[in-house]
């Protein structure tokens, strides 16, 4: 293994093909070792949590406003990462504007109530709150950091086939329970209003390669396209080494591209529960095959804009907590050393 800071740059290896990004947090932005690694290898950044609604919505300030349609926002965490990206010449993906998760319960409640049994706000109220929130965020970012954000994740994870609800939507989501499908259109309409030149609007989801979910996502994208509301499909890419299927990923990417959409891989990692030699070789093979596939599609004319890893090193991966076992899913290990998977990704670029 080699020190990541002594290795050739990932993003420079792929700069003729697509951006290479990473999900980062505020700690990384202020830690010298992480800062150096990020500057060397990535030309796109995504906030892992700092730009989700729960990190931006300000409850006390919302109550003080006495406006039941307009929540207050606090951009302290957003701005910290935006400054880091701007000062280092790195483009940003904004993740995410509308999501059922990591959005405070009071945002969906009548009178901004925090009570466990709070009455839900009406559909009309929620659609107004959604539009106001999206426009507040986009206006702030685009005015304070012009040209920095190139893509907005407008809606995140609206499809869940296992629920078998109409449209295979995530029916238990407070957005769907209150607003139904209309929330999707409202979110993208608001984002179109707030969009700056050169920015794209993205629908983002996991397991987007799985055929049943893929087809449901395509149905949703086609509906959004009737109003020209979506530009990009975000294929998250949270894979597990034992069942990752690169041909299915390719098939899905081709299907989304056939709609005329740009493609981004937005949250790439491959769960691997051992760092022994056999697992390391298998992880490297999968990463190499995956990037070779993406490069091939790009060379065929499919508009793959960016590939973003969900984390920088194995140390900061969310998967160890989520999977409840140590995960080794990324290209750099806990000591910031390049793994075999890094070598495979670099080889695929040639």
Regions found by a protein language model. Name each.
Residues 20, 92, 201, 263, ...:
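Hydrophobic/aromatic residues located in beta-strands of well-ordered beta-sheets
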Residues 26-39, 131-140, 211-224, 287-294:
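Short, acidic/polar
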Residues 1-44, 48-50:
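Boundary/entry segment of secreted carbohydrate-active catalytic domains
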Residues 42-49, 150, 156, 199-205, ...:
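Aromatic- and acid-rich polysaccharide-binding/catalytic face
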Residues 23-33, 54-57, 69-76, 159-163, ...:
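Acidic-and-aromatic substrate-binding clefts and catalytic sites of carbohydrate-active enzymes
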Residues 40, 44-61, 67-202, 206-208, ...:
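Substrate-binding cleft and catalytic face of glycoside hydrolase catalytic domains
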Residues 6-15, 82-86, 188-196, 225, ...:
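Surface-exposed amphipathic alpha-helices with a cationic face
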Residues 3-10, 57, 126, 140-147, ...:
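Aromatic-rich peripheral "rim/lid" segments of glycoside hydrolase catalytic domains that contact
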